[in-house]
Amino acid sequence: MAIRLGVVSYLNTKPLVHAFEMGEVDHDFELVYDVPSVCARKLHDQDTDVALIPAIEIARAPEPYSIVEGVGIASRGPVRSVFLVLNRDPADVRTLALDTSSRSSVALSRILLQKRFGAHLEDTIDAEPDVDVMLDNADAAVVIGDIALELDRSRYRVVDMGDAWTEWTGLPFVYACWTGRKYAIDREGCDALVRAKASGLLHVDAIAEAYAADHPYDAVFYSAYLSQAIHYGLGDAELEGMHRYFAYANELGLIDRVPTIDFYSE
């Protein structure tokens, strides 16, 4: 029986699954595509077995989750697709419009506003990802994914949250990783995910060229994003960044506990 693999339907996920889509790596997965928050919900509801979910969801899991070693979606500076868009100084933000597609970015925005910039948030508003509408109803907006990547930044005051996090903490930020219940995937399945990542990183230019055919920028723009802004490893620095993130989220009451990070190989 195929392992149901929850896949985020964003450009930055493509290098992790391109090899599966193109038949370049043997696997036993059924690929199920959704936005990050829905991937997390489907994993929670056991509609998928393993999924690429926002890191914050590891701390909110109904039972301990394990993660696949060595594969994630992270940044070590500007990420170019996770933004806090402002109509006033960060310290003066009182209301925040949230694009609920990604719970990690929502939690990160609150950590940065409250702990780094000293804002006193009074209210958050769930919203569809339309920047102008969001800013009509709030002091700031969280905008993520392909919409953020293609945002005309000259029109707005923008904080790149990946850059703000790393400048503040000196650590990478991990947005998502392959996650599931303890025995949902075996060593062979984990190895397939690692091989798919390695293969995908060799095909970034081809991925970018195919994506550019239906999007406003050229392949060079998208290739630079995938190869420079996004990092797909999950090393010691990334794990330290995750732990710091969980600790801050716990301090703000966004999660009830700081989880232990367990790998499938353990």
Model-derived regions: residue spans:
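Short, well-ordered beta-strand elements
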Residues: 1-9, 29-32, 94-97
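Beta->alpha turn/N-cap motifs
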Residues: 11-12, 35-36, 47-59, 71, ...
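Ligand-binding cleft/hinge of the Venus flytrap
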Residues: 15-27, 106-126, 205-212
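A bilobed periplasmic-binding-protein/Venus flytrap-type ligand-binding module shared by bacterial periplasmic
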Residues: 19, 81-90, 95, 173-188
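Short helix-initiation/N-cap motifs at beta->coil->alpha
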Residues: 30-41, 120-139
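A conserved helix-loop-strand patch within extracytoplasmic ligand-binding domains
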Residues: 71-131, 164-166
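Pocket-lining segment of extracytoplasmic ligand-binding domains
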Residues: 125-211
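Secondary-structure end/capping motifs
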Residues: 184-251
